[in-house]
Regions:
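Ligand-binding pockets and gating/stacking loops
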Residues: 1-247
Length: 247
C-alpha cells in the first residue's frame, strides 16, 4: 500500500534489486515548483527502516519504507533524525538566527568564489578531455552558487528561532512535533515547497502506550471486524490526526 500511496501504480512483486513502481506525485511537484528552492523536496520519516531484502509477502523492503519515488526504479529514503534534517536545511550552524545565517552565507560565497577562480586558472593548462571534465565540475559549482543566491534572498525571512536538535527525541509524540516544526520552518523560509512525512514504515508495528494501546499497529489493522481491536485502531487514527494540530 505504501508504494502505491503517491504513485497510483501496482509495484512489481520482487524481493530482489529489480524493483519497479512509478514516479510519486510529490516528485512530479518537485520537478515543477521545486526548481526555485534550495531543496526540490524533503523526505522525512519517524521510524528506522530496512531498504534491502524482502519485507512483506514477496515484496522488497524498498516498497515498504518510503512513499517518495523519483522514478519507477528510484525510491527516496527518508530521514528520521531531526538533527540531520536541520543541518540539511541550515547547514552546520546551530541556530536559525538570521544574523548567524547571513554570516554563514557570506562565508560560503567567499569559498565558492575562490573555487571558481582557481578552477578557471587551471583550465588554461588542461587538454580537451580534462577541460570537458572541468566544465562539468564548474556546472555543478554554479548550481551550488545558484542555490546559495536563492538562500541569501530568503535569509531575511522572519523565522522562529530553533536551535539544532540533539537527535531523535525519546517519544513518538515529541518526534512528530519536532519534525513538524522543521517542516514549518522549511516552508516559512522557502527552502522547499514539497515535503513527505511518513509516520511509520509499512508493517512497522509501532505501539502506542501513551494512549493506552500496547498492541502493534500493523497487527491491529488486521482486526477481522473484532470490535475491541477496531476501537484500538480508531484511537491510533485519532491520535495521528490530533498531532497534526501542532503543525
Amino acid at each position: 500500500a505504501g508504494a502505491s500511496w503517491l504513485t497510483g501504480v501496482q509495484p512489481k512483486k520482487t524481493r530482489g534489486a529489480d524493483i519497479r513502481n512509478g514516479m510519486s506525485v510529490d516528485q512530479m511537484l518537485a520537478e515543477g515548483i521545486g526548481r526555485s528552492t534550495p531543496l526540490p523536496s524533503l523526505e522525512l520519516g519517524l521510524q528506522d527502516v530496512r531498504m534491502v531484502g524482502g519485507c512483506d509477502s514477496g515484496y522488497s523492503c524498498a516498497y515498504s519504507n518510503t512513499i517518495a519515488w523519483n522514478s519507477p526504479t528510484t525510491p527516496l529514503p527518508y530521514e528520521t533524525n531531526p538533527r540531520r534534517v536541520f543541518e540539511r536545511l541550515f547547514g552546520d550552524g546551530d541556530t536559525t538566527d538570521p544574523v548567524v545565517r547571513a554570516t554563514r552565507a557570506r562565508q560560503n560565497r567567499s569559498l565558492l568564489d575562490f573555487v571558481l577562480g582557481d578552477a578557471q586558472r587551471l583550465g588554461a593548462s588542461l587538454g580537451a578531455g580534462d577541460r570537458r571534465k572541468l566544465s562539468d565540475y564548474l556546472d555543478s559549482v554554479r548550481e551550488v552558487e545558484r542555490r546559495i543566491q536563492n538562500t541569501e534572498q530568503r535569509d531575511g525571512a522572519e523565522l522562529p528561532t530553533l536551535d539544532r536538535p540533539d537527535g531523535v527525541p525519546p517519544t513518538f509524540e515529541e518526534h512528530v512535533e519536532l519534525m513538524s516544526d522543521l517542516v514549518a520552518i522549511a516552508f516559512q523560509a522557502d527552502l522547499t515547497r514539497v515535503v513527505t512525512l511518513m509516520y511509520s514504515r509499512e508493517g512497522g508495528n509501532r505501539t502506542y502506550r501513551a494512549i493506552g494501546v500496547p498492541d502493534a499497529h500493523h497487527g491491529l489493522s488486521h482486526h477481522q471486524n473484532d470490535p475491541a481491536r477496531m476501537a484500538r485502531l480508531q484511537l491510533i487514527d485519532q491520535h495521528h490526526v490530533a498531532m497534526l494540530a501542532h503543525f
